[in-house]
Amino acid sequence: MENERITKLRAAVKPYLTDKRYAHTLAVEQEAAALAGIYLPEKEEKLRIAALLHDITKKESTEKQLQMCAEFGIMVDEDAILAPKTFHAKTAAALAARDFAAYTDEEICRGIRYHTTGRADMTVFEAIVYLADYIEQTRTFADCVTLRQYFYSRIAKEGTANRDIILRDTMI
């Protein structure tokens, strides 16, 4: 049976996304659920939520992203200015915490926050959101396809006993 909260959230995020981005978001949700089955089955719903919210500010212009950063008190340093396509991770996490508070918690918001850049010592939850965004099935870039094949071929070959090593190796 479909989770009613997730069904409602899917509908709620749709206005924030272009049609293409919505399709990507649903694919990330499916990938996050698949990865949850391997790594964190008890957190599948939370991973689905993070996936559904991860790009809710992606369609905003750089100017709007900077306005949102100011509104939410997000520091924007020189390095960030050089990579404006990563702003949406910070602003989406902040917007999700405010506008989707009934769905989010700190772990979900951190997963959203680090889904583009990653970070040192990522949690398994954060790594799943990051990886799901990159290897979801609608991604056809050569690097995405190669990494998806690498990850799942290793899981198929080695099983889940080495899952932590496989995740770490995939994140490098």
Locate predicted features.
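Short, Lys/Arg-rich amphipathic segments at extreme N-termini
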Residues: 2-34
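Divalent metal-dependent catalytic cores for phosphoryl transfer on phosphate-bearing substrates
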Residues: 8-15, 33-34, 38-167
